[in-house]
């Protein structure tokens, strides 16, 4: 059924390609597809003052932030609005994306259009793309669909050679596609005194002592996302306040509303698993612990790369009790 729905969806996009085939590309029009705000907001903020016509396709949660930019055209994400999305994309000179968007596999890109990927991570510890164990490489139709989406990308923003290696393996990217500019999501950290801002945030939120944040990666099923018992954690470690934020795709109401970058600044220690946020923490010179209760299962189902496997066991905890002991 899922494959049938995808086939129908791609058929609609091909039909829309025909409708907007003659729509001219506007040299100052940029479309930004926003799933992870922290990855593309710095791009919006940099481009807006330069007079570009910017269209953002994103979640309703981001509309309020974008209202400060009076001339930005906001289109809510969702399959019901695919007609408006393709219309906007058909006239864009540059399209900026931050993750995998199925529609790009069916979009008929015009010769003078460029798609730039600013992947939603400072690095990678898990497999993704064609190296993800969930991708059945023997299924030619599945692999072909993934490749159509990956091949739509012209350029990748990267912050270091390890991600070049990952993109080559996962997306079959080539050397000429990499823009070694660094990542927009890291720019805000370079513009502030992190220690000073950490103290300001602790005061703002009424937090005394140390802060531990728990920021696990995406898992396919919500029931597989184990949360840390906040009461038990703080009773065992009274000098700590624990804040949790799950991956945006599986977020719950039981987590903090503080935005991710503020949490990273607030933190004295980052608890993650296979998430790239541990790499981001190193840029902030903050220690990380890896709570990897399902390491064997995750390796089997999704796959963990050589960078994860190089992490010493001393930094890994497989139970909540072990995690607490390592923090004492």
Give the label of every model feature segment:
Residues 39-47, 169-170, 180-253, 317:
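Conserved catalytic-core segment of nucleotide-activated headgroup transferases in glycan assembly
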Residues 276-328:
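Catalytic binding pocket for nucleotide-activated donors in carbohydrate/polymer assembly enzymes
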């Amino acid at each position: 059924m899922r494959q049938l729905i995808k086939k129908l969806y791609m058929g609609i996009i091909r039909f829309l390609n025909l409708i907007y085939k003659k729509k001219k590309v506007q040299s100052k029009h940029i479309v930004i597809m926003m799933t992870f705000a922290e990855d593309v907001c710095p791009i919006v903020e940099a481009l807006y003052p330069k007079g570009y016509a910017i269209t953002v396709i994103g979640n309703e949660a981001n509309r309020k932030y974008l209202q400060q930019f009076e001339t930005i055209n906001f289109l809510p994400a969702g399959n019901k609005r695919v007609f408006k999305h393709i219309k906007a994309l058909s006239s864009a000179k540059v399209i900026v994306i931050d993750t995998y968007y199925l529609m790009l596999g069916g979009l008929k890109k015009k010769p003078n259009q460029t798609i730039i990927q600013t992947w939603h991570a400072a690095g990678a510890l898990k497999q993704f793309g064609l190296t993800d164990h969930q991708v059945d490489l023997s299924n030619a139709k599945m692999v072909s669909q993934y490749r159509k989406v990956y091949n739509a990308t012209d350029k990748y923003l990267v912050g270091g050679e390890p991600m070049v290696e990952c993109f080559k393996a996962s997306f079959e990217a080539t050397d000429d596609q990499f823009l070694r500019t660094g990542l927009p999501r890291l720019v805000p950290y370079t513009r502030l005194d992190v220690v000073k801002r950490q103290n300001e945030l602790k005061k703002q939120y009424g937090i005394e002592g140390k802060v531990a944040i728990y920021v696990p990666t995406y898992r396919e099923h919500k029931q597989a996302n184990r949360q840390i018992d906040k009461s038990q954690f703080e009773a065992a470690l009274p000098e700590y306040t624990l804040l949790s934020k799950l991956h945006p795709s599986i977020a719950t109401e039981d987590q903090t509303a503080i935005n991710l970058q503020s949490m990273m600044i607030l933190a004295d220690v980052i608890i993650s698993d296979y998430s790239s946020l541990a790499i981001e923490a190193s840029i902030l010179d903050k220690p990380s612990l890896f709570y990897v209760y399902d390491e064997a299962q995750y390796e089997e189902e999704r796959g963990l790369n050589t960078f994860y496997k190089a992490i010493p066991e001393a930094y890994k905890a497989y139970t909540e009790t072990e995690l607490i002991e390592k923090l004492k």
